[in-house]
Amino acid sequence: MLSPRRFILVVTILGLLGHNLTHVLNSPHRILLDTDVDTDDFIALLYLLKLNKTEFDLVGITLSANSWTNAGHGVNHIYDILYMMGRDDITVGVGGEGGILEDGTILPDVGDYLPIIEQGMTTAGGCRYRQSIPKGRIQKIDSNYGFRKHFLPQGNRRYTPLEQPTAQKVIVDKVSEGPISIFVIGSHTNLALFMMSNPHLKHNIQHIYVMGGSVRCQNPNGFCGNLFTDYTSNPYAEFNIFTDPFAAYQVFRLLWFL
């Protein structure tokens, strides 16, 4: 038979456990989005922002700034969408070097990065996979600056070269805060660098969802990829994997250790 003192202790412990369990069950699913700011990514971002925040809470966004868009216009576009949706509380980080000044001057290598196999543990340099997008399309997509300028309400947040939070800092901060799911809808560079550098934080990653690759392709013409260059040169490559295949390899390999 338990003594009154021990009984009180047991009841107290059970009460604390029940309180913590209720807190966990009632907590929203925390989400971090890693994007290359392609046009379809805007729709994905808007969808996440429309979800009930008490159930699904987007807490951070990181940009994988490659040849598809550049860091300055991409970050500003994201900022304006967040402002329009009333979510200026969301931190935005960018992987890549360079910048755009307030007067529109484009600094060298804006938003580019070396594929992970060439860059070591940094995110600086030029992208060697520009063959995946013809030059004309790059310039057309960079004109998303004009889209945001004419169609989106603009808040006060702006991309500032050398002061913008890095993608790695945002990922580390958000994963360190507690359990989180990571959505990757661009190249895998940012996530691969994080997973390789911060194995001690893997226990906080609940799920990783990626948009990339092709499985059991049944195209009768043999074209299973989606590159913008001539399909016959690489009929199987998928854009998000192709832009940094070694990073994708690292993500898939390290997933087994989560």
From Swiss-Prot:
GO cellular component terms listed in the entry, alphabetical order: apoplast
Localization of this protein: Secreted, Extracellular space, Apoplast
GO molecular function: hydrolase activity, hydrolyzing N-glycosyl compounds
Glycosylation sites recorded in the entry for this protein: 52
Superkingdom, taxonomy of origin: Eukaryota
EC numbers, comma separated: 3.2.2.-
Keyword Nucleus (UniProt): no
Leader sequence residues: 1-22
Keywords per UniProt: Apoplast, Glycoprotein, Hydrolase, Secreted, Signal
Gene3D superfamilies: Ribonucleoside hydrolase-like (3.90.245.10)
SUPFAM superfamilies for the chain: Nucleoside hydrolase
Enzyme class: hydrolase
Similarity comment text for this entry: Belongs to the IUNH family.
The protein's name: Nucleoside hydrolase 5
